[in-house]
Amino acid sequence: MSAKNLIRAAAFLMFACAVLHSFAWTRAFADFSPEVRQLAALLWFLLGIDWAVVAGLWVMGASQGVAARRLLLFSAVVPIAVAVGLILTIGPLFFPIYLQLGAAGLLLLGTFRLA
């Protein structure tokens, strides 16, 4: 698989994370107390948008190739930080951790293979 296609696959996986996250929107209301429900809903919404934007930036970075290498590498911080946060708060058995790490891994592999 070419480097650009690996980056596009990472973007697809990150966008899938955003879609799955937005489908679970109503769960945010059930899992939190009424005092913090508004804040939880806002954070839930912002994470979905964040991941969709990152996926879009990765697609644009793949089309630019080597010129976007530094920015692509820097943007890998987003899914890695999310995965680490989920491991620390929920535990390592939570499936979305591996979606985030998979997206970051594909991105890093594709970015390092850019010629």
Per-region residue spans from a language model:
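Membrane-helix boundary connector in multi-pass membrane proteins
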Residues: 63-98, 110-115
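Positively charged n-region of N-terminal signal peptides that target proteins for export
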Residues: 1-4, 113-115
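Non-cytosolic membrane-interface motifs at loop->transmembrane helix junctions
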Residues: 34-41, 93-103
